[in-house]
Amino acid sequence: GEGLRPRFILAYFLAAVLAIPAWLALSRRLGKHRTWCVAMMLAIVAFATVPLIPHGAFGAFFAVCVLTGAALGADLALPPSIQADVVDYDAWKQGEARAGFLFALWSMATKFAQALAVGIGLPLVAALGFDPAQVTAPGQFALTVIYAWFPIVFKVIAVALVWNFTLDERRLL
């Protein structure tokens, strides 16, 4: 399994890059916000299966890497485009350019979310019995559950917030 790690990582990022054109095409039909939500739902379904994958089922984990990587393609392409729409709308609504402020705010929120994930995830996995110095089956399962299901919680919240986001292409025009 350890020797396959580079292939899993390559599959993940290659799927992200290759999926971007498909996400962009879908966003022209569904809108950016809902397309991003569809991608997050794909990641949710893929991540939900991880604790159910038997030890050594590398093909199944490879499929998870490809699916979550494809979802990453939307994460890379759509939020910056949505941000640009927000900047344009804000400039029109406020009558002044505040792009620097808005991008700084977005960057700060992203860093806060990452810090929150680490600040909650690592103590939680330790509390559930994972010890990297002495890996046990229950500890390994706890790590797997946190790795897979912890992002699901935040993605479900994100989908709920983004699905009906009122600023879309029609409102900008």
Regions found by a protein language model. Give the residues of each.
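Membrane-embedded alpha-helical bundles of multi-pass transporters/translocases
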Residues: 1-173
